[in-house]
C-alpha cells in the first residue's frame, strides 16, 4: 500500500516475494485518501502524516479481513513493541501476532533460516512513512545495540545500574528505558473507569473460564 511513487522499489520487491511464494497480492495506492484529508487539514508535521498513512493502511486491511472472514497478522516484533515504535491503531493493530515475541535481530535470523532473499534481509528497516525514513535513524540506535540492551534488561532482568556497570553506555540505556516507560499505553487495552461491581474487560471471565 504505497503512498505516491516514493516506494516503488518496495512495491516491486513485495510483489516479487508474493509471486515466489504463490500468494495472491493487490497493490492499493493510499495517496488519494491521505491527500484528500490533508488538502482540507494541511500540516507540515511528518509524524502526523506518517501516522495517518499507517492507519489508512490498517483500515484497508481490516476491510479486506471482514470481506474474507480472515484474521490480520501483526508484523510488530518484540523490539518495536517494547519501544512503542509503531502507530497505535495503525501498524500495531492486528488480531494475532506470530513474531511479537521475537526481537528484531531474531526476526532477521528467522528470515535467513526460512530463505528470505538477501535483498530483503539487508534492506534498511523502514516503516515507509516518508521518503528516506529509516527505523534506526528515528531511534538513534542500531537494532543490534537495542536488542543487546533489551535482552539484558527484559529477559535477564538486569537493572539499569547493572547494565551500565557491565559496559553499556548510560545514555543509550536510559533512552531505551524511557522509551519502554513512555509507550506502556500502547501495550495495554484502554483503561475503563470502574463505576459498577462488574466491569467489562476487567471482571467478566472468558466463557471457557466460567466453569473453573
Annotate the PLM regions.
Residues 1-84, 163:
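ATP-dependent adenylation/nucleotidyltransferase module used to activate substrates
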Residues 27-32, 101-108, 208-212:
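Short C-terminal domain-edge/linker segments immediately following a structured domain
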